[in-house]
Amino acid sequence: MKQRIKTRHMILGVMCLMYFIAYIDRVNISVAAPLIREEMGLTTSQLGLVFSAFAYPYAAMQILGGWMADKFGPKKVLIVLSLIWGVATVLTGFAGSVLILVVLRFVLGIGEGGAFPTATRAFTYWMPVAERGFAQGITHSFARLGGAITPPVVLVIVAAAGWREAFIVLGAVSLGWTLLYAFFFKDSPDKHSRVTAQELQEIGYRHGDSRQAAKAATPWRRLFRRMWLVTFVDFCYGWSLWVYLTWLPSYLKEARGFDLKQLALFTALPLMAGVVGDTLGGVLSDRIYKRTGNLRLARGAVLFVGLAGSLMFIAPMTFTADAVNAVILLSLSFFFLELTNAVLWSLPLDIAGKYAGTAGGMMNTGFGVAGMVSPVVFGYLIERTGSYDLPFMISGALLGVGALASLFINPLLTVDSPDEKAGEVRHALP
């Protein structure tokens, strides 16, 4: 007899598709950037401004989007957000000036800003504790897969029609996902007609949990105390990630001499390495937890190894003269960087439980702030020095600081547990 696919895994599949599409819409501007820059006559500083315009509302929407998901449910919130970013992507194809580009990237940031915290809130009630690392890992691996296929997809559409048409097509795909999500997703398992009593037991969901959470007051002070260090580490992680998402195609073209045809392959390689890292990081963390029962070790070990490993490969990349070797080192660095992503997104679930949407938004504010600063600083330093070396060195330094800070993160210090009893709650999970 054929085994029935669990509803939670189908929900996970829908979320994977959202992460995949969201990253295509986020990264497409960097792939089209050389053509946009040529058509509109933009400087590197102006291009950096276009890149960073996304990050300001993205950061601002993190906590707000997560809080709205906690209060109003992830279904309504994510439908509105995906409509906003889908329309913004379509309209980018009609932009005629740098100002319009900045405005539309800003609107895109509003739409995408609350999406991942909202998804994290959904996982609180749809995914059991032992599957959360995998869920965060696989969704973010689909995000990186979206980023990895963006160069060839965008360049194929560009070759056939133009860069404007690429944004119109990709925006239409985003709006199509909104329809799928609105049809299939429910805020909690007990509301879904396909979920069996056995699966409810496997998930560990109790009837009324989501309604009680919506009525509960948000413990802002305790959330901040538990999440500020996670937010800082996410900033250190995000600084380097934004470099990959915004400047990688320009770096490979201008500093390493790859032509447009080669860019499709060599831009995708580091991002594909990230796909593997994302998935493996979540699986490793879950496996360590299942074998040891030590949640702090399961999260902390993967965080430290990922950030330190990324630094280990980004440092020699700046000194190698061979372009292919540089891509290999970038790919290895990005693989280790992405090992940390699933763990970072699992921490709000571990620490905050029913407030995971707000906590996830709080954490990802660090990522958003990095997105405000990193692309602009990167572009400014390139313009001032004529080289990409110093910006990459700054990224490496932040990876080192983040690795050290990760050693002090303790997911056993939950929002509901007093500090003095943290040592007694080794197995306590939300």
Swiss-Prot record:
One of its GO terms (cellular component) is plasma membrane. InterPro entries: MFS, MFS_dom, MFS_Na/Anion_cotransporter, MFS_trans_sf, Sugar_P_transporter. It is found in: Cell membrane. The chain crosses the membrane at residues 47-67, 83-103, 142-162, 165-185, 228-248, 263-283, 301-321, 327-347, 362-382, 390-410. Signal peptide: none annotated. Disruption phenotype: Mutants do not grow with sulfoacetate, but can use acetate, taurine, isethionate and sulfoacetaldehyde. Mutants are also unable to induce expression of the sau cluster. It is a multi-pass membrane protein. Induction: Induced by sulfoacetate. GO terms for molecular function: transmembrane transporter activity. Keywords: Cell membrane, Membrane, Transmembrane, Transmembrane helix, Transport. Pfam families: MFS_1. May transport sulfoacetate into the cell. PANTHER family: FI19708P1-RELATED, SOLUTE CARRIER FAMILY 17. Belongs to the major facilitator superfamily. This is Probable sulfoacetate transporter SauU. The lineage of its organism: Bacteria, Pseudomonadati, Pseudomonadota, Betaproteobacteria, Burkholderiales. The gene is sauU.
